[in-house]
C-alpha cells in the first residue's frame, strides 16, 4: 500500500489548503493508499519555511501551501525547486491572474477570509437580536444591546434597528408610552448606549393621520390628536431627562441619515469610555 505524506503550509490557519488536500485524497481508493496530512500554520518568517522544507525532504512529503505574502511565497518556491520537492501552490497562480485583471494591489494579509466569515456571522447575530428584542419584547436585551433606541410611536425605531443590525450593531428599541412603565433596567444600564428619537408635533400628527387613513379609520381618533401627541412628547422628555441620554430629531431625516448620526454618537461615547 502506498503511503502519501502531505504537508499543509499556510501563513494563516491552513484550513483552505487542508480542505483541498483532503478533497483530492478522497478521490482515491483508501485500500490502495494511506495518507497523512501535517499542518504547519502561521508561516510568517523564512525560518518557518526552512522548517517545512526540512521535514518535506526527510519524509518525501508533498507540500500544499497557501501563502499570500510575496516574499514568503517566492522563498518557498525557490526552496522547493532547489530540493526538487513536489508541491502545489493553491493561491499563487490565481493571485497572479487577479493582479493582471484588477488595477489595484491586493492587501497581502493572511487570514482575511476568516475575518470576513466572522464579520458575516456577527451581522447575522445582530439581525436576529434586533428581531428578538424589537418593541421592548424582553428587558433582558437591555444589557446585551450595543444600542438602545427610545421613542414614541412612528419614530422609525424598528427600521432603524434593522438598518443598524446590518451594520453589525445589536440594537434593542423601547416604545415610550405614558400608560406603560418602562423596564427598571433602563435606568441601570449605561446611558451612553441609549439614544432617544425625537419628532416634531406637526410631523407626528401628519404621520399618524396618514396611518389612520391606511387603516381605514377616521382622523379624529385620539391617537392622532394634538392633545395626545403633546402628552406623549411631554412624557418622552421627562423620561429621557431621567435617563440622561442624547436626543436625535428624526423629523426630517431619512433612515440612513439618522442611523449615521446614531453611529457617530455611539462611537464618540465608546471613545470617551
Swiss-Prot record:
Binding-site residues, ADP: 151-158
GO molecular function: ADP binding; ATP binding; phosphotransferase activity, phosphate group as acceptor; protein serine/threonine kinase activity
UniProt superkingdom: Bacteria
Matches recorded under NCBIfam families: PRK05339.1
EC number(s) stated in the UniProt entry for this protein: 2.7.11.32, 2.7.4.27
InterPro entries: Kinase-pyrophosphorylase (IPR005177), PPDK_reg (IPR026565)
Ranges annotated as spanning the membrane: none
Family to which the UniProt record says this protein belongs: Belongs to the pyruvate, phosphate/water dikinase regulatory protein family. PDRP subfamily.
Reported function: Bifunctional serine/threonine kinase and phosphorylase involved in the regulation of the pyruvate, phosphate dikinase (PPDK) by catalyzing its phosphorylation/dephosphorylation.
Catalytic activity: N(tele)-phospho-L-histidyl/L-threonyl-[pyruvate, phosphate dikinase] + ADP = N(tele)-phospho-L-histidyl/O-phospho-L-threonyl-[pyruvate, phosphate dikinase] + AMP + H(+); N(tele)-phospho-L-histidyl/O-phospho-L-threonyl-[pyruvate, phosphate dikinase] + phosphate + H(+) = N(tele)-phospho-L-histidyl/L-threonyl-[pyruvate, phosphate dikinase] + diphosphate
Keywords annotated in UniProt: Kinase, Nucleotide-binding, Serine/threonine-protein kinase, Transferase
Name of the featured protein: Putative pyruvate, phosphate dikinase regulatory protein 2
HAMAP family on file: PDRP (MF_00921)
Amino acid at each position: 500500500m502506498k503511503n502519501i505524506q502531505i504537508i499543509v503550509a499556510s501563513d494563516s490557519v491552513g484550513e483552505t489548503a487542508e480542505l483541498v488536500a483532503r478533497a483530492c485524497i478522497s478521490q482515491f481508493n483508501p485500500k490502495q493508499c494511506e495518507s497523512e496530512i501535517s499542518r504547519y500554520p502561521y508561516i510568517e518568517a523564512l525560518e518557518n519555511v526552512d522548517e517545512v522544507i526540512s521535514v518535506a525532504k526527510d519524509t518525501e512529503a508533498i507540500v500544499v501551501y497557501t501563502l499570500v505574502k510575496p516574499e514568503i511565497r517566492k522563498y518557498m518556491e525557490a526552496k522547493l525547486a532547489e530540493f526538487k520537492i513536489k508541491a502545489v501552490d493553491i493561491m499563487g497562480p490565481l493571485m497572479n491572474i487577479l493582479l493582471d485583471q484588477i488595477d489595484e494591489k491586493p492587501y497581502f494579509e493572511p487570514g482575511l477570509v476568516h475575518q470576513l466569515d466572522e464579520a458575516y456571522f456577527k451581522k447575522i447575530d445582530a439581525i436576529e437580536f434586533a428581531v428578538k428584542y424589537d418593541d421592548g419584547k424582553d428587558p433582558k436585551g437591555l444589557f446585551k444591546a450595543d444600542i438602545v433606541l427610545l421613542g414614541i410611536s412612528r419614530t422609525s425605531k424598528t427600521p432603524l434597528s434593522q438598518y443598524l443590525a446590518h451594520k453589525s450593531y445589536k440594537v434593542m428599541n423601547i416604545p415610550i408610552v405614558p400608560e406603560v412603565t418602562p423596564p427598571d433596567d433602563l435606568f441601570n444600564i449605561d446611558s451612553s448606549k441609549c439614544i432617544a428619537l425625537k419628532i416634531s408635533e406637526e410631523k407626528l400628527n401628519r404621520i399618524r393621520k396618514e396611518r389612520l387613513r391606511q387603516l381605514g379609520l377616521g382622523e379624529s381618533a385620539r391617537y392622532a390628536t394634538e392633545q395626545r401627541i403633546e402628552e406623549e412628547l411631554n412624557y418622552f422628555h421627562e423620561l429621557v431627562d431621567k435617563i440622561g441620554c442624547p436626543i436625535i430629531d428624526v423629523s426630517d431625516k431619512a433612515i440612513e441619515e439618522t442611523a449615521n448620526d446614531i453611529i457617530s454618537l455611539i462611537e464618540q461615547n465608546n471613545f470617551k469610555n
